[in-house]
């Protein structure tokens, strides 16, 4: 059956909020390395609060979705996309906690590049939440997501290949742990992009 369209739904606004939380998590994690004392405590608190806020937004999204009379896409598709963005945020936050505990003075350039491209994808996902009723516009955004995802994958491969070059064993272990933590976030984000592609194929 064709899906009915409403002018706006709280569920879609919550989806945009989840994408914004992902963007904020990237911004926080990019700044967490090298923090000490009260500044480190503040950074840890902000990461924890962001994680909790994102979880609350997902619950609000689910409530709005269950109470909606009509939705622009099947409910299970919307939930899969929203929960995927939330999972990505949680993994980025976990990477931030790891970076802080690893006591890194600064993030490697590759890590900053990865975070930058994840932030770009978060912006595109927020745009996609507003385009769900326009499949042509959503497909164009999805193509940009794929390009950004491929760039992130290339950066990650270069980073992993460069690990161990001119690094002490202790620094190597720290960078490897951070790299794999961010890789987990990239895998979650890749699943979101794949799920969005499946929606586009089915609804076209």
Q: How would you name each of these model-derived features?
A:
Residues 1-204:
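Cytosolic, long alpha-helical scaffolding segments
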């Amino acid at each position: 059956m064709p899906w009915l369209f409403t002018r706006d739904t709280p569920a879609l606004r919550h989806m945009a909020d989840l994408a914004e939380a992902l963007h904020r998590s990237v911004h926080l994690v990019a700044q967490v390395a090298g923090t000490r004392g009260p500044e480190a405590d503040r950074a840890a608190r902000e990461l924890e609060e962001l994680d909790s806020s994102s979880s609350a937004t997902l619950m609000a999204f689910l409530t709005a979705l269950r109470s909606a009379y009509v939705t622009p896409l099947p409910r299970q598709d919307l939930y899969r996309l929203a929960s995927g963005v939330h999972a990505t945020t949680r993994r980025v936050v976990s990477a931030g906690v790891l970076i802080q505990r690893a006591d890194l003075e600064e993030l490697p350039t590759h890590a900053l590049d990865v975070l930058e491209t994840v932030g770009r994808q978060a912006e595109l996902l927020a745009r996609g939440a507003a385009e769900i009723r326009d499949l042509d516009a959503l497909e164009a955004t999805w193509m940009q997501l794929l390009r950004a995802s491929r760039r992130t994958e290339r950066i990650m491969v270069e980073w992993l290949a460069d690990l161990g070059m001119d690094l002490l064993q202790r620094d190597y272990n720290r960078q490897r742990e951070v790299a794999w933590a961010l890789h987990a976030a990239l895998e979650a984000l890749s699943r979101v992009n794949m799920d969005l592609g499946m929606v586009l194929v089915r609804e076209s």
